[in-house]
């Protein structure tokens, strides 16, 4: 004979809401998009650089405030690909610090080890670290890709403001010394670059690789640059390398 024991009371169902996890929240890791954007605005206000790449970075965040690198609670793996390119800019005659290499590497490490300051106003609080990564990754990406593709120096500005006219006593004008048609990065390029950052990894890596000049002399000059320590010769090589970027 079998006995079945049952309760006359109805089964009580348990519902779990987000509020039930509130006690598990750690303020050190508490971030929001609004607070990240607020810190990006602070970085923009203190950024006085007048390079075209940096102005493009500021323009993106001033107009759309769209996150390009930060995913849900992490940073895109494309950041590592970008850093691998920046780590080799010394072979092009540049300092890594011009592309924020040390800052970005350190902040990426902080994110991946959750090494944040507990005080929200501290320099290395989670919000400030994510804001720095978002802003300076974009600046580094545009500095590298725009510089490699179009040149790190604008030849129109560099050469057409040297020879001041003496016959114009009312206005400051200059004789044009550079008139060769040369492409410059515009808003269309900026939109393309931002879309590449948001896109898939293959296109991102391909975009970086194809940013370098197509001039066949470029590779020869780079090779020569890395074989000599003569300052005057290196200076001439760097000038010719830059000319290869003006297309």
Where are these regions (language model features)?
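Auxiliary tRNA-acceptor-end handling modules of aminoacyl-tRNA synthetases
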Residues: 9-247
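C-terminal motif of bacterial Sec signal peptides marking the signal peptidase cleavage site
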Residues: 4-7
């Amino acid at each position: 004979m079998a006995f079945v024991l049952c309760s006359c009371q109805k089964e009580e169902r348990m519902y779990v809401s987000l509020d039930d996890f509130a006690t598990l929240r750690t303020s050190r890791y508490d971030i929001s998009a609004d607070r990240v954007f607020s810190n990006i605005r602070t970085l923009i206000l203190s950024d006085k650089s007048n390079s075209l790449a940096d102005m493009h970075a500021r323009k993106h965040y001033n107009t759309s405030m769209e996150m390009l690198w930060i995913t849900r609670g992490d940073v895109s793996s494309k950041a590592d690909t970008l850093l691998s390119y920046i780590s080799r800019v010394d072979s092009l005659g540049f300092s890594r610090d011009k592309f924020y290499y040390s800052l970005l590497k350190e902040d990426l490490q902080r994110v991946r080890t959750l090494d944040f300051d507990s005080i929200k106003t501290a320099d290395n609080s989670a919000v400030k670290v994510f804001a720095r990564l978002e802003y300076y990754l974009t600046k580094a990406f545009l500095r590298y890709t725009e510089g490699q593709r179009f040149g790190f120096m604008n030849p129109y500005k560099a050469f057409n403001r040297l020879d001041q006219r003496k016959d114009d006593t009312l206005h400051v004008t200059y004789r044009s010394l550079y008139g060769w048609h040369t492409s410059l990065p515009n808003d269309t390029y900026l939109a393309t670059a931002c879309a590449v950052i948001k896109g898939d990894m293959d296109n991102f890596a391909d975009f970086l690789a194809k940013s370098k000049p197509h001039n066949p002399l470029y590779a020869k000059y780079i090779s020569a640059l890395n074989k000599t320590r003569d300052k005057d010769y290196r200076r001439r090589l760097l000038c010719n390398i830059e000319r290869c970027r003006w297309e």
